[in-house]
Amino acid sequence: MIINGVTIDDTFAEAFGMRGTRVIITAQNLRWAYNAARAMTGFATSVIACGVEAGIERELTPEETPDGRPGVSILMFAMSSAVLIKQLETRMGQCVLTCPTAAAFSGIDEGYPEITRINLGKNLRFFGDGFQISKVFNGKRYWRVPVMDGEFLTEETTGMIRSVGGGNFLILAESQPQALAACEAAIDAMSKIPNVIMPFPGGVVRSGSKVGSKYKALIASTNDAFCPTLKGITKTELSPEIESVMEIVIDGLTDPDIRVAMRAGIAAACELGAKNGIKRISAGNYGGKLGPYHFKLREIMA
């Protein structure tokens, strides 16, 4: 398959089952909603070392939020319920409770076959030292916690569902600037898709990895088959003209969400085309042996 001169490899991205949740963060204005959201989703690029993968999903108008203030929605994913629950509570306490004027609400209440309620502000209420009060409104419990700027308002729980993490594709280009330009175009397109995040810096990862290493202490190491500087000394996957490879990783609330995002991102990269140095689109997998979700590139782009 060739799109605008760009070869789409006959391969697939291999992804894994995860647990995911959404939190709606509001504040007096968007500046402070983003401050809380960026702090809460910081150091959350990969579950390998960060515990969770998290990112800002989208901006919300006052008409879309529970308290009628501007806000943003964030998504968080982990490999287990226990890790997600702990990370959510820790990040809420350190990043949202602390942020001036910020409030937090459940982002998943319906629309999925199996929703588990997990703590959002249930335990944070104890920061109020006995002065906190609760209110049940439309079947939901909220907590009002006194803080120095007034009150911290938080919903007691949010929803957790079975999700998918690790959808991905690789952009192979003739130069680093061209690869980065294609990634930026892809991320701009994918950022408009709901229910997904691209958790790496700016949505892009340059240090793609393979399983294993010559060093026993490492479980993963550089993906030498896709490193352009190693073409002459390793079993390379790169043709001579490829001088830069970058990867976009996608986490989504459902399998179809990731497919929609991958299609949008790949299409945007291919729009730049071969004339702008974009030569191939590929994907990372483990031979289909580890992850139950297989996102076939040509099937997605058909």
Swiss-Prot record:
Signal peptide stretch: none
Residue pairs linked by disulfide bridges in the UniProt entry: none
HAMAP family: FTR (MF_00579)
Keyword entries, A-Z: Acyltransferase, Cytoplasm, One-carbon metabolism, Transferase
GO molecular function, one term: formylmethanofuran-tetrahydromethanopterin N-formyltransferase activity
Organism this protein belongs to: Methylobacillus flagellatus (strain ATCC 51484 / DSM 6875 / VKM B-1610 / KT)
Record protein name field: Formylmethanofuran--tetrahydromethanopterin formyltransferase
BP terms from Gene Ontology: formaldehyde catabolic process; one-carbon metabolic process
Cellular compartments annotated: Cytoplasm
Role: Catalyzes the transfer of a formyl group from 5-formyl tetrahydromethanopterin (5-formyl-H(4)MPT) to methanofuran (MFR) to produce formylmethanofuran (formyl-MFR) and tetrahydromethanopterin (H(4)MPT).
Family listed: Belongs to the FTR family.
Reactions it catalyzes: N-formylmethanofuran + 5,6,7,8-tetrahydromethanopterin + H(+) = N(5)-formyl-5,6,7,8-tetrahydromethanopterin + methanofuran
Top EC category: transferase
Self-association and partners: Homotetramer.
Pathway participation: One-carbon metabolism; formaldehyde degradation; formate from formaldehyde (H(4)MPT route): step 4/5
InterPro entries listed in its UniProt record: ForMFR_H4MPT_ForTrfase, ForMFR_H4MPT_ForTrfase_C, ForMFR_H4MPT_ForTrfase_fd-like, ForMFR_H4MPT_ForTrfase_N
